[in-house]
C-alpha cells in the first residue's frame, strides 16, 4: 500500500525569494506527501551540498526518481538509502541535498497519510515522550542575517517557564513586540532580518540591554520565567589570517572569546549559546563547556552539522552539550535520526531548527515532537516561521 508510484519535483520560492526544491510523493494506495527544502545563510563548512534548484531537480529526476519508484514509503531507511545510492557521494553533491531532503520528508508524509496518522506519530516510535519542545524565538538579529546590525547573529527569547506550548509561542511573540517598543523608546529605527527578527543598527552591548529589558517586561506580564540565548555564528566572525574573532574594529583571541562568552552567560543568565566558537575548534568548545556547561546549553550547529562523525568527535572531546538538528544539513530524515539517537545516548540535548531561507513546510515541528526534543528554533514572526509554530500548537492540542 505504501509503495511509491510517483515523484514530482518543482521549483518554489523560499522566504528570501530564492528558488528551492519542492517534492511530491504518491503511493499506490493514494497516499500523498509534500516536502520543501529550506536553505541557510550562515552555512557550516561541512554541510551537505545544496545545488542550484534547477540543477538539483534535473539530477534527481535522472538518478533518484527511477530508484525510488517501487520503494515502500513506510520504510524511511529504504527511501533514504535509495537516495544515497542514487547520489553516490558522501555529501549529496551529485543530486543536491535540497532535492534529497525534500523527497525524504515528502515520503515520510506520504507514509503517514496512508496510515491516517499525524507525521509526528509516524516518525516518533519509541522516541516520543510526554514533553513538548520549548520554542526559541529570534527577536534581534544581525550577522549573516542582517549585515548592518549586530555582530552576534541571533538574540533568542527562551520561555523556559511556560506551562504550555501555546503560552510559550505567544510569549516569544510578545518579546518580539516588546523589543520594538524598547527600540522605539530609544529612537532606534529597525528593519527586519532574514528570519523576521528586528535588525537595529546598534552595538551588541546595546542589543543585550534592549533584549534584557524586553524579556523583563514580558516576564512580568505573563508570570513565568523567560530567559534568552544567542546564536553567535562564530565561524562567520573568525578570521583565519588574524587567528581572531573580529567584531568590527575589535578582535578577540580564542581565550578572550571564551572569557567573553562565559561572562555573558553569567551576566545575563543565558539559557543557550549556539556556535560561540569556530566550527573547527573542538578544544575551545570543550574548554567553554567545562566552564559554563553546568548552567547553560553550549550548542554545536556549524560544529556538528547534524553529522554523526562530527558529533562523535565532539562527544569524545567534551565539546558542547547540545546539538542543533537541521535535516537539510545532512540530506535525509534517516541521517537526521542517527544524529539525534547518538546525541540522546550521550546526554546531549537536541534542538530542532529551521533555516534562514524557509518555506511553509512544517516537518520540523513534527520532528521536534516525535523525537522528544527539548527545544525548537523556528523564529517568531513571518508566515514561514508561524507555519511551524502554529503547527506545534495544533500538535500539542491534538496530543494532550
UniProtKB/Swiss-Prot annotation:
Query: Which Pfam families would you find in this protein's record?
Result: Enolase_C (PF00113), Enolase_N (PF03952)
UniProt keyword Metal-binding, yes or no: yes
Q: Name one GO cellular component term.
A: extracellular region
Matching CDD domains, A to Z?
A: enolase (cd03313)
UniProt keywords (A-Z) are: Cytoplasm, Glycolysis, Lyase, Magnesium, Metal-binding, Secreted
Enzyme Commission numbers on file? 4.2.1.11
Cite the GO molecular-function annotations of the record. Answer: magnesium ion binding; phosphopyruvate hydratase activity
What subcellular compartments does it reside in? Answer: Cytoplasm; Secreted; Cell surface
Q: Write down the chemical reaction(s) this protein catalyses.
A: (2R)-2-phosphoglycerate = phosphoenolpyruvate + H2O
Q: State the active site.
A: 195, 326
Top EC group: lyase
Per UniProt, the cofactor note for this protein states: Binds a second Mg(2+) ion via substrate during catalysis.
- What metabolic or biological pathway is this protein involved in? Carbohydrate degradation; glycolysis; pyruvate from D-glyceraldehyde 3-phosphate: step 4/5
Identify the residues that bind (2R)-2-phosphoglycerate: 153, 326, 355-356, 377
Residues holding Mg(2+): 231, 274, 301
One biological process term in Gene Ontology: glycolytic process
Q: Which cofactor does it need?
A: Mg(2+)
For the keyword Cell cycle, the answer is no
Check the record and name the NCBIfam families matching this protein.
eno (TIGR01060)
Please give the HAMAP family that the UniProt record associates with this protein.
Enolase
Recorded family membership: Belongs to the enolase family.
What function is annotated for this protein? Catalyzes the reversible conversion of 2-phosphoglycerate (2-PG) into phosphoenolpyruvate (PEP). It is essential for the degradation of carbohydrates via glycolysis.
Please identify the protein, giving its name as recorded: Enolase
Q: Which species is this record about?
A: Halorubrum lacusprofundi (strain ATCC 49239 / DSM 5036 / JCM 8891 / ACAM 34)
Gene field: eno
Amino acid at each position: 500500500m505504501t509503495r511509491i508510484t510517483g515523484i514530482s519535483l518543482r521549483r518554489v520560492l523560499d522566504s528570501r525569494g530564492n528558488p528551492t526544491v519542492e517534492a511530491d510523493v504518491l503511493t499506490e494506495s493514494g497516499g500523498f506527501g509534500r516536502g520543501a527544502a529550506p536553505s541557510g545563510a550562515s552555512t557550516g563548512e561541512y554541510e551537505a551540498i545544496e545545488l542550484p534548484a534547477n540543477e538539483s531537480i534535473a539530477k534527481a529526476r535522472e538518478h533518484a526518481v527511477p530508484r525510488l519508484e517501487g520503494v515502500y514509503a513506510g520504510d524511511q531507511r529504504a527511501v533514504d538509502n535509495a537516495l544515497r545510492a542514487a547520489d553516490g557521494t558522501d555529501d549529496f553533491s551529485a543530486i543536491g541535498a535540497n532535492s534529497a531532503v525534500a523527497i525524504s520528508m515528502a515520503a515520510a508524509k506520504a507514509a503517514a497519510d496512508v496510515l491516517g496518522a499525524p507525521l509526528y506519530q509516524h516518525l516518533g516510535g519509541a522516541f516520543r515522550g510526554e514533553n513538548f519542545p520549548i520554542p526559541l524565538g529570534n527577536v534581534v538579529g544581525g550577522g549573516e542575517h542582517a549585515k548592518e546590525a549586530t555582530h552576534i547573529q541571533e538574540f533568542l527569547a527562551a520561555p523556559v517557564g511556560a506551562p504550555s506550548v501555546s503560552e510559550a509561542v505567544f510569549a516569544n511573540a510578545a518579546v518580539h513586540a516588546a523589543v520594538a517598543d524598547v527600540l522605539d523608546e530609544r529612537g532606534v529605527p529597525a528593519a527586519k532580518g532574514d528570519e523576521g527578527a528586528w535588525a537595529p543598527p546598534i552595538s551588541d552591548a546595546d542589543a543585550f540591554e534592549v533584549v534584557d529589558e524586553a524579556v523583563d517586561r514580558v516576564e512580568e506580564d505573563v508570570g513565568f520565567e523567560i530567559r534568552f540565548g544567542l546564536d553567535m555564528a562564530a565561524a562567520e566572525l573568525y578570521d583565519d589570517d588574524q587567528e581572531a574573532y573580529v567584531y568590527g574594529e575589535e578582535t578577540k583571541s580564542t581565550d578572550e572569546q571564551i572569557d567573553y562568552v562565559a561572562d555573558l552567560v553569567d551576566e545575563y543568565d543565558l539559557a543557550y549559546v549556539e556556535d560561540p566558537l569556530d566550527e573547527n575548534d573542538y578544544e575551545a568548545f570543550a574548554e567553554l563547556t567545562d566552564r559554563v556547561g553546568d548552567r547553560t546549553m553550549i550548542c554545536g550547529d556549524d560544529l556538528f552539522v547534524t553529522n554523526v562523525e562530527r558529533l562523535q568527535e565532539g562527544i569524545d572531546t567534551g565539546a558542547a552539550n547540545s546539538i542543533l538538528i537541521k535535516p537539510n544539513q545532512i540530506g535525509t530524515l534517516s541521517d537526521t535520526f542517527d544524529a539525534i539517537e547518538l546525541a540522546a545516548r550521550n546526554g546531549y540535548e537536541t534542538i530542532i531548527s529551521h533555516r534562514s531561507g524557509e518555506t511553509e513546510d512544517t516537518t520540523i515541528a513534527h520532528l521536534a515532537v516525535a523525537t522528544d526534543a527539548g527545544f525548537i528554533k523556528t523564529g517568531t514572526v513571518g508566515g514561514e516561521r508561524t507555519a511551524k509554530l502554529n503547527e506545534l500548537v495544533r500538535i500539542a492540542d491534538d496530543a494532550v
